[in-house]
Amino acid sequence: MTIQKNWQELIRPNKLVVTPGSDPTRFATLVAEPLERGFGQTLGNALRRVLLSSLQGAAVQSVHIDGVLHEFSSIAGVREDVTDIVLNIKDISIKMQGEGPKRMVVKKQGPGTVTAGDIQTVGDVVVLNPDLQICTLDEGAEIRMEFTVAGGKGYVAAERNRPEDAPIGLIPVDSLFSPVRKVSYKVENTREGQILDYDKLTMTIETNGAISPDDAVAYAARILQDQLNVFVNFEEPRKEVTQEIIPDLAFNPAFLKKVDELELSVRSANCLKNDNIVYIGDLVQKSEAEMLRTPNFGRKSLNEIKEVLAQMGLHLGMEVPGWPPENIDELAKRFEDHY
């Protein structure tokens, strides 16, 4: 037995379906199927943990408010205490290009509300939730705040954001660097051919807009790939690459696909098998009337088959010249990557 069979003979997802949410930059659902039984939980849990803990992002590390010495202060004419202001600052979502730290400033006079959109940023820093309310100013009140923004990953508590030489009045802030806000997943059974207990992994992801959900999953998968490489203690045998000559066919290569690879109900699949219909090329030449004469084959099965064929651009009652070819089994193997 060759070592490659350990991974080459496992079923792998043949597609990753991404369904955008109401805001495609922030919300999406991703579906991967089919997976070997148990792999849905394995991959879903691993990806979720990496998504929430290991992706790089940007966040406010500290703030300096003019006239304020510490976070337990209050500011004349400002309705919120400094503690509440700092809690609001934690929720500012930021996208930053390049390396930090960077500076942002907000200066405003009352009356009115100070929002994240009032912050003056440099060109490579973008505030992603400008409607976020930071504080409320009364008539005649004024506030000026200077923020330090840096890059990082995961969650960093305020105590770790305080530099050793921090000046008086510098208030460290809890930093949530991860651009991913929420991740959930579920695993369901799915069907591949006649096997009904493969896994289907569905992941629902919300980001802060600094990265799209599908890119976030791609980066998380790349992190896992990189971390797992150290466990591979062998070199794979090199495969001789030969240029395969693909013969010209007088018919659609899809006709060489076996009908048991279609996602048909057990009843429909058994009817085709009992009627010795092996390949799609056998099936499409049948008329609707011929199919309905098949024992135990009813209108429901007919509609199911017509729908599956339509998805492939095919239909019943087709003429297939040169069918069946003499070397049909050999051709089916050679063309299995072409339909």
From Swiss-Prot:
Free-text comment about domains: The N-terminal domain is essential for RNAP assembly and basal transcription, whereas the C-terminal domain is involved in interaction with transcriptional regulators and with upstream promoter elements.
This protein's name: DNA-directed RNA polymerase subunit alpha
Quaternary structure note: Homodimer. The RNAP catalytic core consists of 2 alpha, 1 beta, 1 beta' and 1 omega subunit. When a sigma factor is associated with the core the holoenzyme is formed, which can initiate transcription.
Chain residue ranges for the region called Alpha C-terminal domain (alpha-CTD): 251-339
Biological process according to GO: DNA-templated transcription
A GO MF label: DNA binding
Family statement drawn from the similarity comment of this UniProt entry: Belongs to the RNA polymerase alpha chain family.
Cellular component GO terms held in the UniProt record: cytoplasm; DNA-directed RNA polymerase complex
Organism expressing this protein natively: Rhodopseudomonas palustris (strain BisB18)
EC primary class: transferase
